[in-house]
Amino acid sequence: LVQPDRPSAEPVGLEPVPFAERTRFSKKIDRIWRERVQAPDSSKIKITPDNFAVSVEVNPPPGLDPTSAIEAARMLKEGGADVINIADGPRASVRMSNQALAQLVLRELDMEVILHVCARDRNLLGLQSDLLAAHVLGVHNLVIITGDPPKLGDYPHATAVFDLDSIGILRMVKGFNRGIDPAGKAFGAATRFMSACGAEP
């Protein structure tokens, strides 16, 4: 894994945006969490759309036509889903960029998305570029994954990059939320990413 040159002193960075203010989804999660923590007996809380967060995964299409994926997202929104999470090359398969589908869902459905960020396919430079682009384009919810090995897909001899693993990307995003890149350099503003990973990332 790449270990960027570290500055001699730990950079101070900016104060991160509070979790509840990063996205609409993070605001709802924060409210639900506080209600559960403060409840005398959280097991007796009635599950309603207001106190339960719903995220459903929709995969990008394997070709050029995103219609079925967008219609699936539309149906899920009408059914009460809060957010659509969009996979990044699941099972090491070739599909449309999840960044593209995320933008279509945002534009056509005005629905928040969670973008999967996979360590497998991008080096340290590409990961940073794609994350900064996603932020500028309004995608602030991330699920960080290491990624399935290429041998599971149609191109078993494809090169897996893995400059960073999922934990390394989480650390990088944490730095971005303080306005600092992996080399410790400030870039003038802080991102407001809400990031998550799997229990076995």
Can you annotate each of these PLM segments?
Residues 1-201:
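Domain-level signal for soluble alpha/beta catalytic cores
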